Amino acid sequence: MIEETEEPAEGFEKFYLYRMIRENWSWFNDETYVDTLNPAAIRRFVEVTHEAYAKCVGDEFGRTVPAIFTDEPQFFFKSVLKFSRERKDVILPYTDDLPDTYRAAYGAEFLPTLPELIWELPGGAWSLARYRYHDHVAERFASAFADTIGEWCEAHNLRLT
């Protein structure tokens, strides 16, 4: 990687990486989708939503209200560039501390692996960096979203669907 002010070596090109928060969208009541990889964001989501349910109908949890339905929780899909000269935006699921938690999980830096996440390797070769990225993002989602909401539901005598 080079600094923004540096020029690439001959035969190489400069690509830019931006961390962006998705724009507000009418599908989500003119808000952005919650960061399902971020435990603090999900705890706040539970405070705003599930705690409101508990105030209104909490006495019926486990009886008249046996479960909470969660409709297709997700994180952003990952896109790739299939050809070295392809020019389009690429989206990668990301959260603020991903480089730190990736380093803690694998003893490796995240940012230098970005080319393997963005471009297909020649001949369809297998990528350890890509495997680790998907494994880590899936684990982040499971621990931040599923565990947080699942534990809240269990503590409130609710099933989670």
Residue ranges and their predicted role:
Residues 1-131, 138-139, 143:
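Mature extracytoplasmic enzyme cores
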Residues 14, 63-68, 150-152, 157-161:
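Beta-sheet entry/capping signal
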Residues 146:
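Active-site acidic/histidine clusters and adjacent loop/turn architecture
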